[in-house]
């Protein structure tokens, strides 16, 4: 398994973050090209951990798993233990692409009655729903879905990883204990998510004197280090069947949430076939449902295939118009 390529996609569930842009990077980023491989994520400290794993003899999946857990420390909006995602893994020797679905799932108790406090036998009229009523589906404990990230990353490691799980996660545990300097990105993510103050624990972690942690502040996450340490030893069971799950469910129930232990013990990520299309003599693979992005991507490529893009400069108005369409 020397040649291995993968793509991960993470989504958030425990804390919904506004989709509006809140970051204005002061300098443009340009494409980077490498010959022997690279690790790319939304935080350089997490990418550095991926490089560390590769230098220890790990493969791409080992590195991706380490990066996925590290992002829970460095930039939780990009990856965290409370969300879910999708992964594509390409095994060159087999010429095969694997799709892992670890999307977060709605709690078993999630229904209109429990979410909106409706009477079970009451006739539901869509006109009765006001926009502000849907805030409970965007923020807080009722907006939370059963997390799939831990299951998905560990399933990927079990199937394709090379190094022992403890070796993969040890640099992440060290990072959480030693702390990281708050980045501009993380600071802005906290600043644009004031609802984090509504929960005492998230307020304790991400705020200082009632203000978002400032840039370059040393943020340590010893509790998260303990959680990841338990996972490194006990695997999926440590998260979905142990005291970690108990604490999440208790916190949910104490805050009018919908989680039950069965949501955690019954959760499983799954391997599925990716979807694909032909684009200019290339076969493009991507994640299928429940991911909506894959279908959108392949549809866009099929539309673009009818246009001769070589006729236009890469930075021309026509090129940008076609791409944006």
Task: Enumerate the language-model features and the residues they cover.
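Bacterial Sec-dependent N-terminal signal peptides
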Residues: 1-20
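Internal alpha/beta scaffold segment
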Residues: 275-277, 282-325
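Noncatalytic scaffold domains of N-terminal-nucleophile
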Residues: 19-48, 52, 60-61, 65-234, ...
């Amino acid at each position: 398994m020397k040649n291995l390529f993968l793509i991960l996609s993470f989504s958030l569930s425990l804390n919904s973050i506004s989709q509006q842009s809140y970051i204005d990077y002061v300098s443009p980023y340009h494409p980077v090209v490498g010959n022997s491989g690279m690790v790319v994520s939304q935080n350089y400290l997490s990418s550095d951990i991926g490089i560390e794993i590769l230098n220890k003899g790990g493969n791409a999946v080992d590195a991706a798993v380490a990066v996925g857990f590290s992002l829970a420390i460095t930039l939780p909006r990009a990856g965290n233990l409370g969300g879910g995602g999708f992964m594509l893994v390409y095994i060159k020797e087999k010429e095969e692409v694997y799709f892992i679905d670890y999307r977060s799932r709605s709690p078993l108790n999630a229904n209109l009655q429990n979410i909106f406090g409706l009477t079970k036998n009451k006739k539901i009229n869509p006109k009765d729903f006001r926009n502000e009523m849907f805030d409970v589906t965007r923020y807080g404990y009722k907006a939370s879905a059963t997390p799939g990230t831990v299951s998905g990353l560990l399933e990927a490691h079990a199937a394709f990883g090379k190094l022992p799980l403890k070796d993969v996660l040890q640099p992440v545990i060290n990072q959480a204990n030693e702390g990281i300097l708050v980045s501009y990105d993380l600071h802005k993510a906290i600043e644009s998510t004031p609802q984090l103050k509504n929960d005492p624990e998230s307020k304790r972690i991400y705020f200082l004197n009632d203000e978002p942690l400032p840039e370059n502040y040393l943020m340590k996450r010893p509790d998260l280090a303990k959680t990841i340490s338990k996972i490194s030893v006990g695997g999926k069971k440590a998260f979905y069947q142990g005291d970690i799950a108990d604490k999440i469910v208790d916190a949910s129930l104490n805050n009018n949430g919908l989680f039950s232990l069965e949501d955690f013990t019954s959760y499983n990520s799954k391997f599925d076939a990716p979807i694909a299309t032909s684009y200019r003599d290339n076969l493009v693979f991507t994640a299928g449902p429940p991911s909506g992005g894959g279908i959108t991507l392949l549809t866009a490529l099929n539309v673009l295939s009818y246009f001769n893009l070589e006729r236009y400069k890469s930075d021309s108005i026509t090129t940008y118009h076609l791409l944006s369409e």
